[in-house]
Structures are given as C-alpha cells and as structure tokens.
Amino acid sequence: MDKLTPSQWKVINKSYEPASTIKVIAGPGSGKTLTLLYKVLHLITVENIKPEEILIFSLTNKAVDSIIENLLSIFENSHTNKEIVHQIGCYTVHGLANRIVVENEGMINIIEEIGWRGLMKLLPPSKRTPHHFRSYKELEKVVKDYKLNNAKNNNPVIEKLVELMDNCKVMTNDDLIIRAKKYLELDSSDSDASSFTQDLRNKYKVVLIDEFQDLYPSLAPLITMICKGKQLIMFGDTNQSIYGFLGSNNEIMSQLDNLHPKNSTTVLKLFDNFRSTPEIISLASKIINRPLAEKQIIDDTDETPSELVRKLPSGVSPQIMTFDDLAAESEFIIDKITQLICSSAKFSDIAILSRTNSHLTAIASILKKYGIPYQKLKSQPDWMDDLRIQFLLDILKVCSLASDEKHNREFNTGDKWQSNFSILVTMSALKGIGDASIQALYKACSLKNLSIWKYLTMVPNFEWPLGLSIKKKMENYTSNLYEMIENDQVHQLDDPMELLEKVASITNNLNLNPTYFQSLSDAQSSLEFKTHLQEMAQVMKVSKSNKPPGISFVKWFLETYFDQTMVFHQSQQALQTTGPGTVKLSTIHSAKGLEFPIVFLTNGSMSNFPMDTNALYVGITRARNLLYMCNMKHERLVSKSSPYSRNIMSNNLFWTYYNKDLKRSVCDVKVTHGYNVQRYNQLRKNFGFYRAYSSLRGCKSVFRRI
C-alpha cells in the first residue's frame, strides 16, 4: 500500500453516513486522486459498501480513464479482486446523462459543428434580418439563449430551428442534462422506467465528485438530484476554477454545500504536495497571493509542519521570459528541448501548454519541422471531433433512422421525422447544394407531412421544387443510400468492417464539397483522417464484442459509441509501451488534473491579453520539476531569465534529483554528461542555435537519430 499522510487518512477513515457530505479541499499535487482511490477501497473493504453502490463523477474522459486505471492498480496491489472495479459506476456527467436519455429515448443526436452548419442552411439569406449569422458559433449562442429564456424572445426562425431539433432528438449538452433530470424525476414505480435510471435513484449509496471546482450551474439539476440522500464526497480546489465562462462555480457549490444538513457536513483539507518542487510552489503561491507562512498551515489543519509532505528543493527556479515573435519563442523551446533530451529527459516528460489551440497548432508545425514527436491532448478523442468522421456517423444515422421510419409510413406523424436532421446535415456537405435548395426541399416536405427521405423516394422528381442539376444531385444521394435503407441492409450488416466499408463507399460517391471539411489534399490531413478512421473502426469492434441480442449492430453502435470509446481507451492503457514517447501539447483547460516533469507554459508573443490568475495557477502547477514560462502577461510576473542559458546541461545535482524523483537510474548522469554536451553542440550547429538569434529554417528530422 502507498504511504499515506495523516490528512489523507482523515478523509479515508471518515465513516459512511447516508445523507451526509464530505468536502475535501485539496491543492494541486496534494495526493487528492490517490486519496479518492483509497477512499473507494476503504468503502468496499471496510465499510462493506458494495462496488455497484458507488458512483464516481468527473468532467473529462481523460480523468475517468485515469481513475479506472488507477483503481485497477490499487485493488490489485491490495490483493483485492480488481475485477470488482468494473462494477463501480465511473462517468463524466455528460456521459451519464447521455446513457440515461439513450436508455429512455433510443438514438439521439448531440449536435456538433457539422450539425450547426447544417442548420445554418435553413436560415433566410438576407443580411438585413436579425437572424443573420456570420458563423455557426453565433447560431449556437442564439439557440442556447432562446432555450434559456423559455422562448420569450420572439424569433420565428429560431423557433422553427428549435422545433426541428426537438422533433429530430437533436440536443445540446445542456439539453442532455435537462432531459436526463426529467427521467430521474419520473415515478420509480413506473413499470416502463429503465433499470439504469432506477439504479441512479435507488441503488447508489455513495457519490464521489472529482474536481468540484470545474462544475457549473447548468449541471446542478442533475447532480443535486442524484446526490440527494446519499453520502456525497467532493474533492477540489477553488484556486483551480477555470470554467467561469460556463457560469459561476459558486452557484452550484452553494447548492451542493446545502444539499444535506450542516451537522451532516464535514470539511477536510489536504495541504501536502507530492508533485511540484518548492521553487514552483513558491511561484504558484505568489500568483494567487497566498502566503506560505507555517502559521497559516497550522491554523488550517491539525498536522504539524513536520507531518506535512513537501519535496526537497531542486535548486532550479522557474524561468520567465519574453519574446518578440513566434520564431524567437519557438527557437527557444526547440533549443531547450534539445538540451533536456541530451541530458536525462524523455520526450514524454515534456508538455507545452497554452491558452489557445491556435497557438498550439503553430508550435506543432514547428515541432514537426524538427522531427520532434508530439501528441495533442484533448478533452475527448480526436476521432470524435473530426468533421469527416462526424459525416460518416451522420450517414449511418440517416440509413438507420430512415430504415426504421419506412415501416411507419401508415402513420401520419407530421414533422416528427428523426432522420430529417441527419439528412439535412449530410446534404449540406454536398458540392453544389446551396441554402436555397435545402430550404425549398424542406418546405416541400413539410407541406406534405413527409420526411425528406420519404419525399425523395415517393414523390415524382418533376414535383420537386428544384433545378435540374440539383435534382440530379438529390437522385445520386438517394440512389447511393437506397439499398441500405429500403432493403434494410443497414440493419443486416453485422460485421463492423463491412459496415464501415459500405458507408465509406457511399461517401466516396456523393461528390462532397471539399471546402466543407479540412483539405483532404494535404498529406498530414489525410494521415490524420486515416488514424481517426482506424480508431473509429476499433471502437466499432469493441461495440460488436458487447452487443446484446435483439438489436442491430448499427443501432447499438450509434446509441453507445460514447461509452464504447471509453471501453476502448481503457483497454489501450495496458498496451502503452516504454520509450522516448512524445511531447504533449495541450490547452491549459485540457491539462486539468494532469502533471508533467517539465512544462513550457506559453501565451504567444502576439497576445495582448493578460493571463487569467486561476488559469495561470493551473498551468504552473502542472509542472513537477522544471517550468519555463514564455510571454506570460500577469501583474505578479516579472520576466528576468536569459533564454540563452545552457546551465541546465551541466547541473548534475539537478539531474540526480530529477531521476530520483521519477524513480529512474541516476548512475549514468555524471558519466554521460560530456557525451551529452557533444551531442547537443552537434544538434545546435545543425539547427543554427550557435547564433544569438536566428530565424527558423527548414531542417532535417535530426531528432529521429537520437
């Protein structure tokens, strides 16, 4: 068992009580996640809480993956059957909401970028009207505001779009939360209620929330309903709250703090720091203006200073620098990575964090030029964000939904055709299909109370209100999908690869508008698409392996691919290999809950915006041993470091400290120093770093040889 601190044991040993709250205030690197994991172990092995009575919430898929992986390790190390970990409910809030709604409604659409683009095709073209939008982001905001105001703002165009979304079961993430709450509110004695929904009401006894500071108001209705009457255990740090743009964290925390009586609420604190060096902690404390006096620590906790865990000083302070342009900043980062790799660091030790994805994209292109392997970290898998993959999913939805609807032609259900949305989205991506054609077709379908698919396959084409060239494109669309829908082939194909090949073949024949997606002519973009397609195929195979009887494969996959992606990622954890790895690129928001031995924190030389205090604090506290800060604009930061220092190369004491901290061998640090310097000098000569300043040039991938 891991060596736990007195403050951690206080949390772990706090006994189970129904309708109670334990709030654990835990700073970065305080062992919060480890405490949560051992609390779960304690509940099962000591408190006799069944694993299926425990529910864990986090906000990101990466955090859920990490919790499950670490639970498996802890249960195995404690000689407890690790298979019971899979009986514990561990979800993102939206993942759980999605499962509730799908279980009660069947297939739904969570609207993504490609969906908003499709909806924009239905908007009138006049720029003089109040419903003209320059981007799908503007439309998304207006629709959200319309729903929040309960349709009080008189806008018939938005009203029609929202009606279409409702009829086609198209939901935003906020809609998902509201809809899930509605099903939890239903009478549990209702015989039609689904078992998972009943379990959330009745089975779970303990709910643990990881990173409570990341919660925002729209999540409150669902979370408070689930947690009421159970033991609620929350872990978090208000200094790391960086989702203020989604609403005030204080609002939802006030509801959770008052969920149970005050005499049933306990607040505990973790002040240890297992992660960052004292030098990094000192800078982080300065940023949030928190004094480090031991008196404050003693006042806030029962531990004495000698009981609190702190790492020894490393002797290396964070470096704070300012650069005039991206070239100078990037050259510094490349040069410093060269020094670090030529010492004792691995690529996998290094993370480059920024506030924006656009700045990370610029840095990624430069890393690629130098042959430095990198990986972008995101809140959800890349394949699910790829517009081309989203299009394939929408084609599958068209086929599945339209095939189901053709059996109901005798029923006059008006405009409530769920396939309409996916058809509009996929048609919007076809070359030569403009807004006017989409609007004319949709209006004609509405007048006849037919779905778009039924209209195109039942109404003679001479009645279509479309030009000849557009009619041909529509006929090509229907002819390519006809066999899948009208012959029910989509529900008969049971092999994931056959289904994917069929959908890919259909897509290839549809004459897509290349400007609707990322350019497929670019080699890197094509390679990314191939990678994402392979991952989608793997998730489909996972879905096939656990498909229950009585449901077609395509329907099962489309209803559960969010959950199946989680299963796939968990299975991949055990397959990770050792080696130099990759440099991690991430926004500060996506790096929440993660740590890295070495962090480059960059804001971009062209950014005139000061860094938000909490975001800067989160970025700083991701670093374990080394921190380099580039163009960080903040009132409590002063740029004072020289970007041309090579001192880290010769600091044997630090590299001994570094390798001990990461539990690596330290015997070769001194012996190989001379060779490392020689290797670095050769690399910097190749790259042009021997000058005080140089512009970036096309370089060979020299790093692949080291």
From Swiss-Prot:
The keyword Nucleotide-binding applies. GO terms for biological process: mitochondrial DNA metabolic process; mitochondrial genome maintenance; recombinational repair. It is found in: Mitochondrion inner membrane. Coiled coil: none annotated. GO terms for cellular component: mitochondrial inner membrane; mitochondrial matrix; mitochondrion; nucleus. It is a peripheral membrane protein. Keywords: ATP-binding, DNA damage, DNA repair, DNA-binding, Helicase, Hydrolase, Isomerase, Magnesium, Membrane, Mitochondrion, Mitochondrion inner membrane, Nucleotide-binding. One of its GO terms (molecular function) is ATP hydrolysis activity. It is an enzyme of class 5 (isomerase). Its EC number is 5.6.2.4. Residues 278-593 form the UvrD-like helicase C-terminal domain. Belongs to the helicase family. UvrD subfamily. Required for mitochondrial genome maintenance and mitochondrial DNA inheritance. This is ATP-dependent DNA helicase HMI1, mitochondrial.
